[in-house]
Regions:
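Divalent metal-coordination and catalytic microenvironments
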Residues: 9, 24, 29, 49, ...
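C-terminal cap of metal-dependent C-N hydrolases
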Residues: 9, 331-379
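Alpha-helix-loop-beta-strand connector modules within alpha/beta enzyme cores
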Residues: 53, 102-114, 180-184, 237
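Hydrophobic faces of well-ordered beta-strands that scaffold small-molecule active sites
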Residues: 57-61, 85-87, 111-115, 153-157, ...
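Divalent-metal coordination cores built from histidine and acidic residues
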Residues: 75-160
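Active-site core of metal-dependent hydrolases
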Residues: 160-261, 265-282
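His/Asp/Glu-enriched, well-ordered alpha-helical/loop segment
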Residues: 257-339
Length: 379
């Protein structure tokens, strides 16, 4: 594999939070220092006026090909500057090992995963998973987290009214899931769309590093009150270390919640796509860079947008020293973007929209030192 030199770009390093004009050199699968460039031919790529970052991490996406709600990892990652993806709990104990065989080990994208507490996971879009704790298989969960520790990173639970309510349960699935996570020593990612219990009660159960998923959902009990202010218990949860993922999806984001929250400075800790076939390269998601552009146009500083797709997800994966930096000796997962001036409308699933004037446009993706995506006009 020949040496690649990205010249004249503006490099952002999330670990140091610095933007710096400099060159980045890659040899083999690693980033190398400029004075370590081996003699011989090198491929020099001019990235003037481009932003160079560590590869993005899509912290919530559905990738298991054995269900009807998944997308292909490499198709949805590399063209968007993404080098690491985390499956959002598509599988439970009954089908996770098949996911490893059919998708995780067969993709160039680095794939991590949540484990759904429901044994069959999200097997079908025709009916919802059964979240009754009576059917949780703790022994199998324990075995999977031991055997697949390099892949499994969290437990996943959905507590929406339309999922939990038909069972006659309320807070029991959440309480039991947290209890299991304590034993497994892992975070819990909780899907909070219209939760069966009030959102302020639900966040009281969450621990530092647990993730409140779909933070800008707009119906039922949400993170903002009728005056458009972020609720006190939500603010307290963030202070004690609970993380908030925007996790857009088809119907999991509404401007009527996001705009007042962001005006209050309540930005997402994590920005993810929640990709499924319904949102594959179409509105309201289109791509992770499109969502990043939306938040930038809503007033979120660029550095914070980048941290929400690199640094915070990498911390959750306990890989920040490898995936959230471009220092010499680390894995050569790199993304290159241009920020272009372009009038663009961003939509939610209700067709509400805002107008923006800048877009983050992918130019190149490098995974483990290999160029896996490149715009035709990038010299």
């Amino acid at each position: 594999m020949e040496t690649v030199i990205l010249k004249n770009g503006t490099v952002y390093d999330p670990l140091t939070k610095d933007f710096e004009k400099k060159d980045i050199a890659v040899s083999g699968k690693k980033i190398i220092a400029a004075d370590e460039i081996p003699s011989g031919k090198a491929s020099i790529i001019d990235v003037t006026d481009c932003l160079v970052t560590p590869g993005l991490i899509d912290y919530h996406i559905h990738l298991y090909s054995g269900c009807d709600g998944a997308v292909k990892a490499d198709i949805m990652t590399f063209p968007n500057g993404v080098t690491t993806a985390v499956d959002g709990g598509t599988c439970g104990v009954s089908n996770f090992e098949m996911f490893v065989k059919t998708d995780i080990t067969q993709s160039l994208t680095r794939i991590k995963s949540y484990l759904n507490v429901s044994p069959a996971g999200l097997a079908s879009s025709v009916f919802s998973e059964n979240v009754n704790p009576e059917y949780y298989d703790l022994e199998k969960m324990r075995d999977l987290f031991h055997t697949y520790s390099e892949h499994l990173v969290a437990l996943k639970l959905r507590i929406s009214r339309n999922i939990v309510g038909s069972s006659g349960l309320t807070r029991e699935p959440l309480i039991q899931t947290i209890k299991i996570a304590e034993e497994l020593e892992c975070p819990v990612v909780v899907h909070m769309n219209d939760p069966i219990i009030d959102v302020e009660e639900a966040v009281e159960y969450l621990r530092p590093c647990d993730v409140f998923c779909h933070m800008y959902y707009g119906d039922g009990s949400t993170i903002v009150n009728h005056q458009g202010m972020v609720k006190e218990k939500i603010l307290e949860a963030r202070k004690r270390g609970v993380l908030f993922d925007a996790c857009n999806g088809k119907g999991n984001f509404q401007f009527k919640t996001a705009i007042p929250a962001i005006q209050n400075g309540f930005y997402p800790d994590i920005i993810s796509t929640d990709f499924s076939p319904m949102t594959q390269y179409v509105h309201p998601v289109i791509s992770l860079p499109h969502l990043m552009s939306k938040y930038m146009n809503m007033g979120m500083p660029l550095a914070e947008v980048l941290n929400a797709v690199i640094l915070e997800p990498a911390r959750q994966l306990k890989m920040e020293e490898e995936l959230a930096t471009l220092k010499a000796g680390t894995t050569a997962d790199i993304a290159v973007f241009k920020i272009v001036e372009k009038d663009t409308r961003f939509y939610d699933f209700t067709e509400a929209s805002i107008e923006g004037h800048q877009l983050i446009v992918p130019q190149m993706t490098i995974k483990d030192g290999a160029i896996v995506y490149r715009q035709t006009d990038l010299d």
